[in-house]
Amino acid sequence: TNINDKSISEIESLSRELKISAGSYAGLDIALWDWKAKKANMPLHALLGLPIPKTKTSLTIGIMSPESVIDRVPLLFDNSTAKYLKIKLGSPEGIDADKIMYEQVLESSKPYNLGLRVDANGGWNTENAKHMIEWLSKRQCDYVEQPLAQGKEKDLKTLYENRLLPIFVDESCRYSQDIIEYSQWVDGVNLKLMKSGGITEGLRVLATAKAFGLETMIGCMSESSISISAAASISGHIDHIDLDSHYNLKPDPASGAKMVNGVTMPRIAPGHGAFLTNENQI
């Protein structure tokens, strides 16, 4: 069947019938939206009726030793206009190791005047999560993401009561229907196109979150400028941005979204604006 004869929503429905994985379909969905915007000779954000992003992105630091933090933070921010740092916690060595690392991040980030946020990647149990949220609330942390493991969503209710920081979910929210189950137990959701199956479902996730009065975030996995540019193209109304993985790729096989005054900005061109720099690398 000619792709022109089918809408993106029809192709999405077919992919679900065929049980195509979210990550695989995300690549196709992004390509379809890019094609549709190019056909209209419009930037993708404009085709979708969205503004260009204005919210500054965070850069991310993984679980590491305090000594590594001392080197890593300046490496990230000495020549960057980013103003937020996301710290991965949930160390297998326990919350004492998390505290030691966070304290070093707090110290090392002072010269850059950064906003700090924490992603526990589901690495805490309910008791430790409650303790860490209280501890972090006294140490300049803006919010905590995915404090509990995927599958432990019912325990979010206990954690949400009397929380001292906003709670976001990431792995616990893949599709828009997930939000309905625990919208009363979280403050926000983190959308990732590779996790949700691309732009089509991603827009549903954002709309559903906003309908329930939740804050929105968009993040990424280890992705190139292709999918980051697509994510940046839909981030104009999103509250928190975490689109930084392409800055770490050496080399990035594509070119597109760049940091402009701390904002991960899509290249303004028809489509999502990204292109392969050398197809032989793929």
Which sequence ranges carry the predicted segments?
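Generic secondary-structure signature for well-ordered alpha-helical cores
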Residues: 2, 78, 107-110, 211-214, ...
